[in-house]
Amino acid sequence: DKTVFELQARDWRKSGDQAEISGKQIAEWMRQLKLSGAGNYGYYPDDFFFDLCDELGLMVWQDFMFACAHYPEDAVFTASVRAEVEDQVLRLRNHACLALWCGNNESQAMHRINADISGDDTPLSGLALYDDLIPGLLRMLDPETPYWPGSPWGGPNPNSMRSGDVHDWTVWHGVPPIPDAYMTEAFASSPKGVAYTRYAEDTARFVSEFGIQGAPALETLRRWMDPADLHPESSGFLARIKDEARKADAMMATVTGLPETIQDYVD
């Protein structure tokens, strides 16, 4: 047994053109990254991925397929979840790389944030899955692998920095820090409020998620967009941004200044 004092990991997301990427390419990329772990959410990777992580000594955090929402607890849906969990656990439980099963991504945390803001603490539908059904199946099928009911989780607030894991979205999203049980301020949207320098305020024991929106490669934009829309102020460009279209302006304003060309935006 060895205690892990530092973990450097990356999210592993299914590529839209996965069929065009060879196993050899994937293996080479993972070797180049020199990581100690990978987190999977949004899908269950195939056996090749887990075999490769076994070979490279990477630890895998595997989410079940729930995120950021209420989920039914009726008999039909529960039976479907049971079948899915049994199928995936039996397939993956013998991999040495499997370090942790996680019940969901952000369901408890987002529910708590919304309740603190609105004052409406409607019970979270889906807790029966994360607190009873899934851990019950794991106790029977894979009692050796740790289970985490959700991410983030721990402490007096699911996203508390006091214990457990934390999703740090003060930077970019403006989510107020939660050093203990409650958010310390209102949501931020100003350049100062969402600045990357606020990472210094994070005292979390384990930060399992953070990030800033990044632009795709210029070649990708040119491939898919009308040439007339290749400008950071065009409606066609802004409409393709998944998050609030002007959110990046606050990040760039005090660091690089606002972009004048699409190349500026990408850079």
Model region roles, listed by residue range:
Residues 1-69, 77-100, 238-267:
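Active-site-adjacent substrate/metal-binding segments within catalytic domains
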Residues 11-13, 45-48, 67-70, 107-111, ...:
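Flexible loop/turn segments at secondary-structure boundaries
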Residues 61, 104, 207:
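Generic enzyme active-site microenvironment
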